[in-house]
Every structure is written in C-alpha cells, then in structure tokens.
C-alpha cells in the first residue's frame, strides 16, 4: 500500500509535463500558433451554431417554454433548467445524459442528433 501511495503522491506533486511541452511547442511556432487559433475559431463557431440550432428546434417543437437563453450563453455547457426528475427521464427513457442540475454538453451535440435530443426534452417537459 505504501508503494501505491508513493506513486500516487508523485503524480499529484509532479504532474506530467507532456501537456505544457506541447503548449510550449505550439506557442513558439508561428505556423502552429496560427493553425491552433484557426481550429479554435472553428470549434467556437461550431458550438455557437449548435446552440442556435438547439434553440430553433426546441422552439419549433414547443412554445410553452423560452429556450432563447441557450443561444446567448457562451462556452461548452448550458443549464437547461430541468428538474432532477426530468433529467432522470432523459437518461432512463432516451439515453441522454447530463448532470442532475440539467447541465448539458453543447459541444457533445451533433446536428444529426439534434431532433432526437430536442424531441426528448420536449417530451419530458410535458406531464
């Protein structure tokens, strides 16, 4: 057990340098920095588009609840404002996973699955 603790402590006290070494290489090479910034911009735009698509599809499928706040947020996640019971129904009935606080990974959505996810959300909103 003491050997395991020793190894574990070493990992936490001295985290691997791989990540920082990669960042160092990218930021000290102008071509790699440009490529990284371009890819980052593409991912930012993808998430922005997914947010807009989610709002549009949800609004087309129901009109009881305003989901426009999703389009105005930033980042990879969004809180949907669902109850714990509704979140559990999404998980158990539709295999859609999120935290119990209804925080969904927008970055994890795809255009192909948008209708399915939206329809499931609408179904759990209705009694």
Task: Describe the residue ranges of each PLM region.
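Residue-level detector of alpha-helix boundaries and kinks
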Residues: 7-8, 39, 75, 102, ...
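PLP-dependent enzyme catalytic core of the Aspartate aminotransferase-like
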Residues: 27, 56-60, 82-127
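Conserved core segment of the aminotransferase class I/II
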Residues: 1-37
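A structural signal for short secondary-structure junctions
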Residues: 15-17, 69-72, 98
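Conserved PLP-binding catalytic core of the aspartate aminotransferase-like
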Residues: 32-93
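Catalytic cores of large soluble enzymes that bind and process phosphate-bearing ligands
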Residues: 11, 15, 42, 46, ...
